[in-house]
Design a protein with these regions (language model features):
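ABC ATPase NBD coupling module
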Residues: 66-80, 84, 89-91, 108-113
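Conserved ABC ATPase "signature" region
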Residues: 113-131, 156
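Conserved ABC ATPase signature
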Residues: 135-139, 143
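Catalytic Walker B motif of ABC-type/P-loop ATPase nucleotide-binding domains
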Residues: 160-164
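ABC ATPase nucleotide-binding domains
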Residues: 235-272
Length: 272
């Protein structure tokens, strides 16, 4: 029988008289990588916040067998990487990674040897030993993303929630970060739920996709089942070519239509 460390039933979030999330049902198996896709405003970040208990919601959330757990229970089970995390510029890598131990440290004590060991292990796992004494402001975008992941790993939660983990990275660093997440998932038996805008990367890395549109689940399944030209046209308002190979979806190529072309770019004129 499959174990679902993360599950939700009829999960609904309302704000300002609007439903941001509407009766979402969710089951994520242990060790699975679930990709959340959908256009901007579809409800991906709201779903993360509802799972974390950061917004008021109705319906049922089950995490590691606990139904509608309190925020501390969720913090112990879920490590969240937001799309734009705050990085205190003068803080060192080691200090920032240690913040991942916050759910384990009570108000009346400082970090223990166990906390320090967990942070050190995360730094080593993300290959950050040489950077651990550097200030965050001196790091490149790719290095910062590894530090953010190290903080999540130091938390020792069984599930990672990643909200656009490759935002603002070039394609090389996007592949590097997602490959790193996949390695950590397999080595440490982690479950991953991530929001990904790039549909080709979502197809290549995620075991299963959940397509959200206006707060509702409109498609769910493998990349082959979800990333159809019909779905992309209906929910992204984009015509596309979906390239397939023997393993399923290989790439999603949006088509530029004539309506999008406004003014021809004039030819470059060389200086005399």
């Amino acid at each position: 029988m499959k174990r679902y460390p993360i599950a939700a039933s009829r999960l609904t979030v309302e704000a300002g008289g609007r439903r941001l999330l509407e009766e979402v049902d969710l089951e994520v198996a242990a060790g699975e990588w679930l990709g959340l896709i959908g256009p901007n405003g579809a409800g991906k970040t709201t779903l993360f916040r509802a799972l974390l208990g950061q917004v008021s919601s109705s319906g049922q959330v089950t995490i590691e067998g606990a139904t509608n757990p309190n925020r501390r229970q969720r913090a112990m089970a879920l490590a969240f990487v937001p799309q734009r995390p705050v990085l205190p510029p003068a803080m060192t890598v080691a200090q920032y990674v240690l913040l991942g131990r916050t759910p384990h440290i009570s108000y009346l004590r400082s970090e223990s040897d166990e906390d320090l060991a967990a942070a050190s292990d995360a730094i080593e796992a993300l290959d950050l030993d040489e950077e651990k004494d550097r200030e965050l402001q001196t790091l490149s975008g790719g290095e910062q993303q590894r530090v953010i992941l190290a903080r999540a790993i130091a938390q020792e939660a069984r599930t990672l929630l990643l909200d656009e983990p490759t935002a603002a990275l070039d394609i090389g660093h996007q592949l590097s970060v997602l490959s790193l997440v996949d390695r950590l998932r397999k080595e440490r038996g982690l479950t991953v739920i991530s929001a990904i805008h790039d549909l080709t990367l979502a197809a290549q890395f995620c075991d299963r996709l959940l397509l959200l549109y206006q707060g509702r689940v409109v498609a769910e399944g493998s990349a082959l089942e979800v990333l159809t030209e019909r779905n992309i046209g209906a929910f992204y308002d984009v015509r596309s070519d979906v390239l397939l190979d023997g393993d399923g979806v290989r790439a999603v190529l949006p088509q530029r239509t004539s309506e999008e072309i406004e003014t021809p770019i004039p030819p470059r004129v060389s200086a005399p």
